[in-house]
Amino acid sequence: MRENTRAQRSVGFLLGLVDEETAVRVRARTGLPEPETPAQARGRVTRAWTWARGLEASVALWIMENDDPQLNALVWRYIPTDSGLRRAIARGVPFAAGRVDPLPVDVTLPGQEPEIPESYVRHGLVGALREVTTVHQGRAAASMVLTRADWATVGAADRERPLPGYARWALNVRPDCPPSVRAGFGTHAKFTHRLRQAGVFESAADYVASEGPAIRVLEVLSMGRLLFPARLKEAEDALRPLVDEHLGDREDAWAVLVQLAETFHGNTPELIVTAGAVA
């Protein structure tokens, strides 16, 4: 069976937000195929090189929240430059809420734990962070913050005496940095913008409104039931009102969306609004 194109998968995800009667009519009008079968979706997930390039840091974390060693091994190559998440995968650190037991590490994991920084060996977790004077040192020291207990320790240390700026920044751009700890590092609008540039989002709703191209976000969302089922509903709830208002049951608007999806440079909300306006 021929695999659906990126545009078909992306529009198909949005089409899943309307009622079945409308979806059937739109497919008949636009020629969109039926939704992927579970087997097709699983096959596409295993071909991570087709969707995981430039994977946003928060999306990588949401995938890791499944505590699935095979998924962890898949995303290993595509996790952003911060080595903290890679170290966590290599050590079997769990990320699902409430889980404390370590995970088995998949035999297909394509790499080893990053080197432990010398400053950590000499000074321990907080001591290494307090010694930071460069960006590189900050990233290295922050990569040793792995568990919930580690984050609690770091947050308490920063409240007692603020950590160096480079250390704070390296911790702040970790997608697994707890909101309570991140709040202590500052809430300036410029700071929030830099977090988004680093691929760190407070929620799935923020992710759907992130910078374009929209097809990049929609393709990842189209695999959300397998990659991050616990986060998908929030993304769907953020997009559904836009879909209802600007596309709804208008077959012509959906036809325009199909034409625009592959080449549109704006983000997902802008794509939806534009398709409705053009039609």
Predicted regions and their residues:
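Alpha-helical scaffold segments
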Residues: 1-279
